[in-house]
Amino acid sequence: MNRKKFIYSGLGSLAIPLLFNNNFLVAREKYTRKIRIGIIGLDSTHALAFTKAIQQGVIKDFENDFTVVAAYPYGSKSIPLSIQRIPKFTAEIESLGVKVYQKIEEVLDNVDAVLLETNDGNLHLEQALQIIKRRKPLFIDKPIANSLEDAIKIFKAASKYNCPIFSTSSLRYLEGISTLDLSKVKGSEVYTPAHTEPSHKDLYWYGIHGVEMLIAIMGADCISVRTIEGIDSSLYIGTWSDGRVATLRGIRKGKDDFGGTVFLEDEIITLGKFQGYNLLLHEILKFFKTKIIPVDPTQTLAICAFIDAATESKEQGGKEILLKDIKKALE
């Protein structure tokens, strides 16, 4: 995968008498000051989990390199779960030494990089644009948006303002996925909890975890999706450009869990268990330090296209939906 590295221009020329001292001070600060992280949205459990891990210095390779210093609490003001969480999570994050501001701009004035953790994907475009225009390296937690259209706008803005961003689910790092020989993958069956929220298209709210797994395993060139609705689950059947087929089972009721099976040329692999957020957080912190994007935007956009097509199929009673038609409608 081609990874784009964003390089920032250095300081301009300085007066000769001040050159040594100023450069020395800048260099000293660069190598001694922790990278300051800001969080937008305190209605996600990820906001607290990430902050605790960073403040406690438990992420390998980056134990002393980062600190969360600022946060903006909102977050959805209409989703019941968010309304319930924000006051509690605000108090908890303040207890971790994080200053809470009432404007996103105030957070951006005091940080070097941003975690966009707002649970409501409908707000991500508006909030991301504020961050991107300030050129702050940005991680957007799932879902990147609530539509392919908004996701495209986010990436276009990032390109325009030369701002490094990426978005992914922690399930991309499920045990077994990263070690696959993707050239040998013939198909896959994965499963995920798929609880819904009225404000979001079907899989964007929670089932996106499973779509992330599917695209990470199969690749970004899915060409069609069909949705079959069951009583307690939904089955999503994807076809790829080379004829391969993969399925996603979205669990509506019953035991929640993540997992799956991958069919290779010479073996069948059962994926491991979800190990928490630290593998994802390691990639985020590495990204904040290097500005190298760990997940290709084409994969993120493929996830959104899959979900939009799955929603369309559901609304049309299980009709197979071509992703090219989803994309064409946005032209």
Kindly give the residue locations of the regions a language model identified.
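C-terminal segment of N-terminal export signals and the immediately downstream linker at the start
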Residues: 1, 20-42, 46-48
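N-terminal export signals
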Residues: 5-26
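NAD(P)-binding Rossmann-fold cofactor-contacting core
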Residues: 62-92
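Beta-loop-alpha module in the N-terminal Rossmann-like domain of NAD(P)-dependent dehydrogenases
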Residues: 98-155
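Glycine-centered short loops/turns at secondary-structure junctions
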Residues: 135, 162, 317-318
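A contiguous active-site-proximal alpha/beta segment in oxidoreductase catalytic domains
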Residues: 144-200
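Rossmann-like dinucleotide-binding domain that binds NAD(P)(H)
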Residues: 188-255, 301-302
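C-terminal active-site/capping subdomain that shapes the small-molecule cofactor and substrate pocket
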Residues: 259-331
